[in-house]
Amino acid sequence: MASRGNRARSQPVDNTISYVQCDGLAAMKMVKHCHEESLNNMEVAQGALLGLVVDDRLEITNCFPFPKSDETIDEEEYQLNMMRRLRHVNVDHFHVGWYQSADVGNFLSSTLLESQYHYQTSIEESVVVIYDTQKSARGFLTLKAYRLTPQAIAMYKERDFTPEALRNLKVGYENLFIEIPIVIKNSALCNIMMSELTELVPEEEGTHFLDLGTASVLENHLRCMMDRVDELNHEATKFNKYQQAAIRQEQEKHRMLAKHAQENAARIAKGEQAVPEEEVNKLFRPIPVPTRLNPMIVSGQINTYAQHISQFCSQSLAKLYMTQALQNAKDNKQ
């Protein structure tokens, strides 16, 4: 654990973007799209982010959703047409990244890593914004912006996911992404309107914040975590089998080389020419090393689920203590 902590602390810092400024309109469009997809067919919602870069600040001023996977539409042509139409109505049309909804608070996947790699190599300042639908539905608006670290970009450039390559690059699930601070900004007129709407909203008694029916949320997180643990165990078994096969092959190779050396010594004693060792090496083909990218991603998913469960349980315990105090106060009054 200490080595992982030291590795995370020694990672290079990406200073391309210091923070992301998102307009309220763009945030609302992302939230609306992600919730509609989660209610309709539980698919992952994705879309393009538009805006501009000012110094070290990335401004997101608008967005639009990507077409669904089952639609026969050329995605690149669709994006170009959308940006062209936005430009005609004097809207920022520069592509600055993309957004995606999170699956039970977990977004890490090989597809997302691959997509963000292509975005950052073509658009240096691009970010991916993750929206957590389930956590936001419980009253916590969760919008987070991420960028790939220099180590992760180097890993994808080399396309070598062997243990040795990941060790040399010092890449782990802890330093795949850099979280960029994100702030939501509204115009002065929007802030005035929000202040007026606040006065029209009836006051809530606040009892819904003490809802203790949280078993389904915790059960869902635990079930997802158990699935990821099973998958990681399967990957570990696969890698252990590779190591055992590599050890057996190496032992057999040493035995054959020793036998070959004895035969060569006998040939030399008889005055015959020795046979080169390459003939023995040709008999042993290198065993392909299993990729370690998927186990690293699964480990990151398990870590995320563990953090969410810990945070969720802490909030639930706080609710229990608050409810107990309110109940005791009610009993004392009676």
UniProtKB/Swiss-Prot annotation:
Record-level GO BP terms: formation of cytoplasmic translation initiation complex; translational initiation
Keywords: Cytoplasm, Initiation factor, Protein biosynthesis
Protein name, per record: Eukaryotic translation initiation factor 3 subunit H
Cell compartment(s), UniProt: Cytoplasm
Chief subcellular location: cytoplasm
GO CC terms of this entry: eukaryotic 43S preinitiation complex; eukaryotic 48S preinitiation complex; eukaryotic translation initiation factor 3 complex
Family (UniProt): Belongs to the eIF-3 subunit H family.
UniProt xrefs under PROSITE patterns: MPN (PS50249)
Protein source organism: Anopheles gambiae (African malaria mosquito)
